[in-house]
A protein has these predicted regions:
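Active-site/acyl-donor-binding loops of N-acyltransferases
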Residues: 2, 114-132, 204, 230-280
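A short helix-loop-beta-strand connector motif used in the catalytic cores of GNAT acetyltransferases and
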Residues: 30, 34-55, 66-67, 121, ...
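Conserved acetyl-CoA-binding loop-helix of GNAT-fold acetyltransferases
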Residues: 79-92, 113, 209-222, 241
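Amide-forming acyltransferase catalytic core, primarily the GNAT-like/NAT-type
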Residues: 19, 116-201
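Conserved beta-strand in the GNAT
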Residues: 45, 51-61, 65-70, 186-195, ...
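A short, internal acetyl-CoA/4′-phosphopantetheine-binding micro-motif in the GNAT/acyltransferase core
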Residues: 71-79, 203-212
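Helix-loop element at the rim of GNAT/NAT acetyltransferase active sites that forms part
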Residues: 12-15, 20-32, 155-166, 224
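Conserved GNAT acetyl-CoA-binding A-motif
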Residues: 93-105, 224-234, 254
Length: 280
């Protein structure tokens, strides 16, 4: 890494620097995702002498068991060791946790060089959905109340393999829509829709089975003035089919990697849509 760059932990006051870096990289999304990252985790920046960011690493630790990592470097500062320094800094902060991250094809070789291995993939869809939500027999939807938080956190921990309380407690109050799927008189899934810049992000969607996930997806995606965006694990065939059937455009695929190729914990088959690929 060049000598005119220093690493430091960023705070909420650095949000304009983060947004400028995102614009430079051409990332979708906006301030809400960055605020969510600040609330639920930590952001480390590579700051240049002129005060701008040459890069940043977003680390979301979950009880020391799992951590999500995302790294971005300004195009003007690529191939100078900044990404490697940010990854090393973030991994040191993550300790012994299982660390996961997403990478597009262009970044895959770098991620493998710093010790990550592919364990899956995620597909991004976006657009204005059409059609109505499916209504599987025996399932219903209802709004979420304050008394539901404990149940949502428990469902989510089973699926993700670690408690994401800080993330969900920051996300749920700011969401455009939150719903529970019920079956047999009990909750069997939940989902969230939240505005992020010029789109409504659909996710997370966590459900015990695909039928409940599809019911949630149709409900969460309907009736927004903005286009929707959803990140779907590549092996969730019913959710992929729903996105295509709703007329959403496939924007691309990112590899899901873990440090050392370690299997990620939890009942991951219950995660049908991510918060976003860059967060968790």
């Amino acid at each position: 890494m060049t000598g005119d760059v220093r690493l430091r932990r960023l705070g909420q006051a650095d949000l304009p620097l983060c947004l400028a870096l995102a614009r430079e990289r051409g990332f979708s999304g906006g301030a809400p995702a960055w605020r969510l990252a600040f609330a639920a985790g930590e952001i480390h920046g590579a700051e240049t002498a002129d005060g701008s960011l040459a890069g940043a690493a977003v680390l979301l630790p979950f009880a020391g068991r799992v951590a999500s990592l995302a790294v971005a470097v300004a195009p003007r500062r690529e191939r100078r060791g900044i990404a490697r320094a940010l990854v090393a800094h973030a991994l040191a902060a993550a300790g012994t946790a299982d660390v996961q991250m997403h990478a597009p094809g262009a970044a895959l070789a770098f991620c493998e060089r710093v010790g990550f291995q592919v364990v899956g993939a995620t597909v991004r869809f976006a657009g204005a959905p059409r059609g109505s939500a499916p209504s599987p027999r025996g399932l219903a939807l209802r709004p979420v109340g304050g008394a539901d938080l404990a149940g949502i956190l428990a469902q989510d921990e089973i699926a993700f393999g670690a408690p994401r309380r800080t993330l969900l407690e920051a996300l749920l109050p700011a969401s455009a829509r939150v719903a529970l799927a019920t079956g047999g008189g009990r909750p069997v899934g939940y989902g969230v829709a939240w505005e992020d810049g010029d789109a409504v992000a659909i996710g997370p969607i966590v459900a015990e089975d695909p039928a409940a996930a599809l019911l949630l997806a149709g409900h969460l995606a309907a009736g927004h003035a903005l286009p929707v965006r959803v990140d779907v694990p590549a092996d969730r065939a019913p959710m992929l089919a729903w996105a295509r059937g709703a007329g959403l455009s496939r924007l691309g695929t990112a590899a899901l990697l873990s440090r050392g190729g370690r299997p990620l914990p939890g009942r991951r088959e219950r995660i049908h849509a991510l918060v976003t690929a860059s967060l968790a």
